[in-house]
Amino acid sequence: MTSKKQKSSIDTITPTPPNTTTTTTTTSTTATTKDKKKSKKPKSSGLTKVGADIIELQASLLNRPARKQATHVNSRYEDHDTDTTEYNIWYHKKLGNRNWKDRDVSETRCNVLKDCGKTRANKDANFCCYFARGKCINGADCTSLHRIPTPEDDKRLRLTHDIFGRERHKTDRDDMNGVGSFSRDNRTLYIGGIKTNVSGSLEDMVRKNFEEWGRIEYVRVITNRSISFVRYLTRSSAEFAKEAMTDQTLDNGELLNIRWATEDSNPYAKKVDERNLHRVATEVINKRIREMTPDDQSALKYQMTGQYPNTDQQYDQNGQPINASPSTPYQLQYRGSTKYEAHPYARQYNNDLQKRVQSGETVDVAPLNGVGNYYSHSVGTMNQELQKQQYDNYMQQYYQAYGYDYSKLSDDQKLQLQQYFQSYYYGNQQEQQQQETQQIQNNNENNNDNEEEDDDDEDDDDDNEDDDNDNEETKDNKNDKVENKEEENKEVQEKINTESKEDTKNEEQEKKEEKEKTDSDNIVNKED
């Protein structure tokens, strides 16, 4: 009795011993067309059981040695004219022409539950690209990983490299092939070349063949264009699936064209990609911080700390907040300070100020040093009884905070403090105004002087131009004289050279004649 649900190829795979050397590892069981017509399989929503458990099934098989998937590596191009004498020592290849083969169905395919196992690679090594294509000839001696990536592997991925250790680029290729781009999260594959004139669900067929490489987020099939889109939960699974399914076939013998999908125009998908990119960036930063030395971490934390105001007076010894009067938006800046703080004096007269503003009495309301508001105040004096009373209350509270009793001071002492306070905070206002006016006058005088100097400079420039013209004429005359002298010197030097050459020739001729005479004399002597 056949079940209504079609079994996938992974369900029927049984692990084989590592000594077996089969090149093709594709196994699939399909139901008969009668069973398909009788039982219509509903569209699957979410992950199937096999796709979710493939990582757990693989984990139980990683203790065995990985088997060799093939005995030789089939190249995608044919070599021609390689029997030449020139050899490239950089690439370790002979020079010659290479012609690419036409696209054809791959002879091998990776079977995870048959081929996975332990190799000589450590846990931080890259994944084997030939293992993904189903044609690794090294097996257990391979220095790369022979398994599919897990979510833990995706966390340690680098943005600039893929899981196979290949360098990624800033932008995608024009044909959307290759290793992909690090500017975006490549998790969606484009599958072209699907046959649509078949019975059964295309989505189930695509899911069955692609869920072997990792957990799938969604599968979308566009029937009228014979294409499909598969989106994985992790980038590592998508990169592995792209290599594993390139030039492969589905259940109907079609040749698949696997590429990276372009950016999705769906706003929801864009938000999801932004969140994933933010998550990946956060994980990379946290990983970088964990890899730092303790000294570097402490230095980084010191840079991240900020300066905060002292709030000790706002809390008692038990750490409970003290009930203080609410602060006002009117603030003063003390001389020499770098922060604005609420002035206690402004808090007390603020209510009276608001009443005056509401009643329209704003003639004498003006900002104090550009910060806060003050009214009816002339520098160096206290011209209202209300202000004197408020000032006394403020000083009493101010000194009470530091442990002093302001009420015990005499009137002369209070007057001295008041004068000191006024001179310290407001005493330099008149001096500043005088300095500004004096500076303006000085600037005007300097401008007038500069104009006169400019006129004098123009006259001097005219005189300088005339002098320059005269100097140029004299220079030209001097240059002509120098040129004439140089020509005369050249002629004299040429004469001297010719005479010296003639003298050397004569000397050489005389030496030759003397030598000939001596040779002839020697010959005569020998004959005698």
From Swiss-Prot:
The chain positions of domain RRM read 187-263
Q: Does the keyword field hold Zinc? A: yes
Main subcellular localization, coarse class? nucleus
Stretches of Basic and acidic residues bias are at 472-528
Describe the family membership recorded for this protein in Swiss-Prot or TrEMBL. Belongs to the RRM CWC2 family.
Q: What the record says about its domains?
A: The C-terminal RRM domain and the zinc finger motif are necessary for RNA-binding.
Any idea what job this protein has? Involved in pre-mRNA splicing. Binds RNA.
Name listed for the protein in its UniProt record: Pre-mRNA-splicing factor cwc2
This chain's source organism reads Dictyostelium discoideum
Gene designation:
cwc2
